[in-house]
Amino acid sequence: ELVTLSGAHTIGQAR
């Protein structure tokens, strides 16, 4: 999972 600059939001997250 790659964490964006927002810190909380992640890309490709399926949780």
UniProtKB/Swiss-Prot annotation:
It catalyses: 2 a phenolic donor + H2O2 = 2 a phenolic radical donor + 2 H2O. One of its GO terms (molecular function) is metal ion binding. One of its GO terms (cellular component) is extracellular region. Binds 1 heme b (iron(II)-protoporphyrin IX) group per subunit. Binds 2 calcium ions per subunit. Heme binds at residue 9. InterPro entries: Haem_peroxidase_sf (IPR010255), Peroxidases_heam-ligand_BS (IPR019793). It is found in: Secreted; Secreted, Cell wall. GO terms for biological process: hydrogen peroxide catabolic process; response to oxidative stress. Its EC number is 1.11.1.7. Keywords: Calcium, Cell wall, Heme, Hydrogen peroxide, Iron, Metal-binding, Oxidoreductase, Peroxidase, Secreted. It is an enzyme of class 1 (oxidoreductase). Ca(2+) binds at residue 10. Its cofactor is heme b; Ca(2+). Its main location: secreted. Belongs to the peroxidase family. Classical plant (class III) peroxidase subfamily. Removal of H(2)O(2), oxidation of toxic reductants, biosynthesis and degradation of lignin, suberization, auxin catabolism, response to environmental stresses such as wounding, pathogen attack and oxidative stress. These functions might be dependent on each isozyme/isoform in each plant tissue. This is Peroxidase 8. It comes from Cycas revoluta (Sago palm). The lineage of its organism: Eukaryota, Viridiplantae, Streptophyta, Embryophyta, Tracheophyta.
